[in-house]
Amino acid sequence: MAFRLAPTDFEMLRTIAEYRIMTSPQLAALLSRSKKGVRDRIGKLITEGLLKEAARGRGQHRGRPERIVFLNKPGVTLLKEQGFIESQIPTSQIIDEKFHYQNHQLLLNWVRIHLNHVKTVTPGLKIRLLSHNSLFISKEFSSISVQSKTGELIRFEPDATFSIYDSNQEKTLLFFLEVDLGTEILASPKRILTDLRQKILNYGICFDTQMYKRYERLWNCQLNGFRLLFLTDTPSQMSKICSLAREMQPSDFIWVTQKDRMFEDGISANIWARGGRLDTSPQSILGSLSCRAPLP
């Protein structure tokens, strides 16, 4: 019998295009499907040449390396023909088999999946997110440009920008997210853009100049500031960033957590060190709507 693509197959292919690389547990969690069912369907899509897979580096996990999947050229062509991807986007921009930042991308994926889950746990919330390397993001909002006190133009890309709208309070909160795996320098005398201290300073300029208010036009909302979120890979890196945040007053807009906290209690729980303060009770980015929302 000839292979036929189901609507759920197009949903899976488009999701992988949006997230760039994924694992079967991520797809199962996001699409609310069984892990076995997702693995089986991935296998068929690989056989049909629409997807490819590769072994993820062993990293911190024991046993066999986790498999990651990504679009193959015929998969890209199909999504373009169906209108899911704009035809002018180069295939080379969509497929990157080198995966220099696969651990970073996969952790960013988990953040997005957790945020998506929050919407099902807390009715009345609307969450809108822009990922820095999404195929579907407008170039206008893929980066932020600010001008330093010396007149230097500084351009930087948050790993993700998202807003949470509470329909009960009719209030929108804006968040910038930085996923940190401990590969960047905390503070360099040269103040390079990847220096975490400089990153925080850049966001401070974004606040002072109210550059963040351009998202009001995108999401048709009113914004009064934002929160800068750091999600770290390890407790030790969380401690380092918290220490840095406490040194850089005012730092109340900086919130820090660690991935194990997110996986255990969910991204909306009281897992965040506000202002880098570890000597006070952790808080929730949802404030009074705080809730535990671990993935099923």
What are these regions (language model features)?
Residues 122-125, 169-171, 216-225:
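Short helix-terminating capping/connector loops at secondary-structure junctions
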Residues 13, 185-192, 201, 210-296:
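Non-catalytic C-terminal interaction segments of nucleic acid-processing enzymes
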Residues 94-100, 133-151, 183-191:
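Surface-exposed cleft-lining segments at the edges of enzyme active sites
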Residues 123-175, 198:
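Active-site metal-binding core of divalent-cation-utilizing nuclease and nuclease-like domains
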Residues 157-159, 174-191:
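Active-site ExK catalytic segment of metal-dependent nucleases
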Residues 56, 132, 178-182, 233:
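Short loop/turn segments at strand-loop or loop-helix junctions that form parts
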Residues 1-99, 105, 296:
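Nuclease-adjacent, charged terminal/linker segments that flank catalytic cores
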